[in-house]
UniProtKB/Swiss-Prot annotation:
Part of the ribosomal stalk of the 50S ribosomal subunit. The N-terminus interacts with L11 and the large rRNA to form the base of the stalk. The C-terminus forms an elongated spine to which L12 dimers bind in a sequential fashion forming a multimeric L10(L12)X complex. Pfam families: Ribosomal_L10. It comes from Rhizobium rhizogenes (strain K84 / ATCC BAA-868). This is Large ribosomal subunit protein uL10. The lineage of its organism: Bacteria, Pseudomonadati, Pseudomonadota, Alphaproteobacteria, Hyphomicrobiales. InterPro entries: Ribosomal_uL10, Ribosomal_uL10-like_sf, Ribosomal_uL10_bac, Ribosomal_uL10_bac_type. Forms part of the ribosomal stalk, playing a central role in the interaction of the ribosome with GTP-bound translation factors. Keywords: Ribonucleoprotein, Ribosomal protein, RNA-binding, rRNA-binding. The keyword Ribonucleoprotein applies.
Amino acid sequence: MERAEKREFVTELNEVFKASGSVVVAHYAGATVAQMNDFRSKMRAAGGTVKVAKNRLAKIALQGTDAEGISNLFTGQTLIAYSTDPITAPKVVVDFAKGNDKIVVLGGAMGTTTLNADGVKSLATLPSLDELRAKLLGMIQTPATRIAGVVAAPASQLARVFSAYAKKDEAA
């Protein structure tokens, strides 16, 4: 990689760190190409990205970003997983690491918060933003449905009473 390419890569990675909702750093030593391709495709399907970068370049790219506190994690063979949704990258990395012992979560960052490996794992257990929206919408709709049922119930009961009186009068 030439000097100009390195500068361009650092600039691109710096923008990624600034725009990402969360960044996860993990070791991938011993992972096969097929495993890495599978990991990348799962991350891409979830809306995230996985990059392998030189540690020195990643540390330079971290300067001036909110995630600057994770620069000490870049030792050995590291990969960077990131996404705009704060939950996506940790969730995919932790799920993939469960089935593959070659991927070891080191830590990460969410905004200005630096996370250790346990922090990333606990973040991965949270529901995604879309799941939270769906739950909130369900909570909002439930009372309205119940109110509509309560309001409609007396009217239907009155209709049944009038119907019973009408049938009684017809029979008499």
